[in-house]
Amino acid sequence: MEKDRSFTDEFEKAISTKYRLYLWSRFVKGIKEYKLLSPGDHICVCISGGKDSMCLAKLFSFLHKHSDFDFDITYLVMDPGYNKKNLDLIKKNLKTLRIPAKIVKTDIFDIANAQTKGSCFLCAKMRRGALYNIAKSMGCNKIALGHHYDDVITTTLMNMLSSGSFQTMLPKLHSSNYPGMELIRPMYYIREKDIISWAKYHNLEFLQCACKFTEEEADTQNAGRRKFVKQLIYDLKKEIPQVEKNIFKAPDNVTLDMILGYKDNGEYHSFLDNYDEE
């Protein structure tokens, strides 16, 4: 997937040298293994302002230069109503990383808070819908998000503990509400600690929670649960060193005749359906 060895800046050089094994190689592995990109794709790389999406943007910038097939990229910052301080930080980092992003202003923070005060779920849903709408209007057929390996295993365990379901965060999925649009997660194999290391190596400062309604109470219910599960995984690792790998692998290692039931296209199937046929 590479053809040009030259570098545009120090960030590209670090991606290809110091962080080649932990960022670049795993980025390319995820794209190849899950077939996330095809010739002629127009990718909307979504930038929230945090470390993950900024790292994703720089990886895509490097990939666009080194790929052996043509595809287009649009870098998008969907501004849901950031305060000036946060927006200025995003702009500063975009300039530092040489990411030519388009910033599209919306009023999602205000609208979501007016409808259901402090509703992170509603805000996230509205932001996702806005991303699809904006990306489609720009001619994109895929949107890329900065979820990583640790997000995947945390989400998998959260679903089991909080909702009694066995679901994971997929590397790609078709949009049910926006025909022809697809969501991809190219950093599926990248560990959060390596993104943090990359940011520290370059002395970069990124947004944490940028919601102006939770700045004084950043630990919302969902954020609190996610933090708890991440700590739980950390603690489990002390006794089970392979626990992260095992959680990640579990959704890819399901034996259907050893589970009570599953859903397929919304229809429930029980192990009893064919139990007496044997």
Model-assigned labels for residue ranges:
Residues 15, 19, 123, 187, ...:
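Catalytic cores of large soluble enzymes that bind and process phosphate-bearing ligands
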Residues 27, 187, 248-251:
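Long, contiguous hydrophobic alpha-helical segments, chiefly transmembrane helices and signal peptides
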Residues 79-81, 107-109, 175, 189, ...:
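Short, solvent-exposed coil/turn elements at secondary-structure transition points
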Residues 204-278:
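The feature marks non-catalytic terminal segments
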Residues 73, 151-232:
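Catalytic subdomain that performs nucleotidyl-dependent activation
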Residues 126-138, 172-178, 231-250:
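Short, basic, helix/turn surface patches
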Residues 2-158, 162-165, 170, 193-201, ...:
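ATP-dependent adenylation/nucleotidyltransferase module used to activate substrates
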